[in-house]
């Protein structure tokens, strides 16, 4: 079965996570994604280990798990485009592509004749997605940007962590590079929008994506809490700024996440907790009142939750329709029956022998389902086949370029 984007080709010049994540989504949807890497070293994340993939004999390879998370379904081609011969090859690939993804510093590719203006001149239908820390304009445009610093600069860390005054209080980053991931998702959305526009106009366009823009946009309700009041939200640990009770609570053997989203659910929770009077208490009648009286209600709940194990709470609360969850580590996540049933852990055969584990795409399309065609590629694994089949180079030409260090 053909993928939804099987008729599209992507030239992925990006490295690390935000750009490769966008490229992997497009590849999962069927696009032919050609990942261009530096000869000899490739994407920085290839070396971001341990852990590293093990081969069929159980020995460590040079393929870091980090790299493996964002590069499946792609072909890897090594080209040194700091050299004229390499620039020519990239331009020829761009002429045969629908989309380019890059995350070099502003102006970084112009020196090699690989910026949007240069490639548009040879392919006016090209969609060119530039991902940077701060965008193509503004006083920070030329600065490098990394997920961790953008989480800090963009306000996310000011909202994450224990409240001031508690032991261990202070700003905390999210446990994954969320700003990079979200930027990859927004980039994919922008690329698909540009493709839809091109279908009508036959004209490509430049996409200017910035990690900081994405981070600020994703402050969502917390941004609006500030913009509507002028008061900056503070860290609340696992608590919610607008809903109570909506946080973690201690149990007899761990923690319980309680996510009471409305007054009806609160009444059910109070009854299950053996504290039905809470639902009729004037301080707790509505969510607005519970938010106002958070400091009084939360200690009362904590005094009750510690008397049952987490699994017991989950069982009785789910039985009456109160949303809740245990706090799972990743071993429990991938053993969870729902995760197993949805097939979120998969394996793909790898060029080094053995198999490479992967997290499946969450996208479920009824007519054009995601296909897992190939494992994340070895460095330069497809250089010869791409240059020979797509650009028409002869084997001798490829060998000559390789000997000269261009490939």
Regions found by a protein language model. Give the residues of each.
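Short, well-structured beta-strand/strand-turn elements
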Residues: 33-36, 318-332, 393-398
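Glycine-rich beta-alpha junction loops
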Residues: 40, 134-135, 211-216, 253, ...
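A glycine-rich dinucleotide-binding beta-alpha-beta segment and adjacent secondary-structure elements
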Residues: 319-373
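Flexible, small-/acidic-enriched active-site or ligand-binding loops
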Residues: 285, 349-400
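N-terminal helix-loop segment corresponding to the beta1-alpha1 unit
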Residues: 1-190, 194-200, 378, 384-407
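Oxidoreductase and adenylate-handling cofactor-binding alpha/beta cores
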Residues: 162, 184-204, 217-228, 270-277
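Aromatic-enriched alpha-helical interface/lid elements that frame and gate functional surfaces
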Residues: 242-320, 324
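Conserved Rossmann-fold dehydrogenase catalytic segment
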Residues: 136, 166-177, 199-215, 234-241, ...
């Amino acid at each position: 079965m053909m993928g939804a984007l099987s008729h599209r080709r992507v030239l992925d010049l990006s490295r690390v996570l935000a750009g490769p994540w966008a490229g992997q989504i497009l590849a999962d949807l069927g696009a032919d994604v050609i990942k261009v890497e530096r000869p000899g070293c490739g994407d920085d994340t290839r070396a971001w280990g341990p852990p590293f993939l093990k081969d069929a004999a159980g020995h460590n390879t040079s393929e870091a798990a980090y790299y493996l998370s964002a590069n499946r379904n792609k072909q890897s081609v090594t080209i040194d485009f700091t050299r004229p011969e390499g620039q020519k090859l990239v331009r020829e690939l761009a002429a045969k592509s629908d989309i380019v993804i890059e995350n070099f510093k502003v102006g970084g590719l112009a020196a090699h004749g690989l910026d949007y203006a240069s490639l548009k001149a040879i392919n006016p239908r090209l969609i060119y997605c530039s991902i940077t820390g701060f965008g193509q304009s503004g006083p920070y445009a030329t600065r490098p940007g990394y997920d961790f610093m953008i989480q800090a600069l963009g306000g996310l860390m000011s909202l994450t962590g224990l409240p001031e005054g508690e032991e261990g209080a202070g700003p905390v980053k999210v446990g994954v590079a969320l700003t990079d991931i979200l930027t990859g998702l927004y980039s994919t959305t922008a690329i698909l929008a540009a493709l839809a526009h091109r279908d009508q106009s036959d004209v490509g366009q430049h996409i200017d994506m910035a990690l900081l823009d994405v981070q600020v946009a994703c402050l969502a309700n917390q941004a609006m809490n500030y913009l509507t009041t002028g008061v900056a939200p503070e860290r609340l640990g696992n608590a919610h700024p607008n809903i109570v009770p909506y946080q973690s609570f201690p149990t007899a053997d761990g923690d319980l996440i309680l996510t009471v989203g409305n007054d009806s659910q609160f009444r059910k929770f109070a009854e299950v907790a053996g504290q039905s009077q809470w639902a009729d208490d004037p301080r707790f009648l509505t969510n607005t009142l519970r938010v106002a009286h958070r400091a009084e209600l939360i200690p009362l709940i904590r005094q009750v939750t510690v008397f049952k194990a987490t699994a017991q709470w989950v069982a009785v609360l789910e039985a009456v329709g109160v949303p809740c969850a245990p706090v799972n580590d990743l071993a429990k996540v991938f053993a969870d029956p729902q995760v197993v049933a949805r097939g979120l852990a998969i394996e793909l055969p790898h060029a080094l022998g053995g198999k490479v584990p992967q997290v499946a795409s969450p996208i479920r399309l009824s007519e054009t389902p995601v296909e897992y065609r190939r494992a994340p590629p070895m460095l330069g694994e497809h250089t010869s086949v791409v240059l020979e089949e797509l650009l028409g180079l002869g084997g001798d030409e490829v060998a000559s370029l390789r000997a000269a260090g261009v490939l």
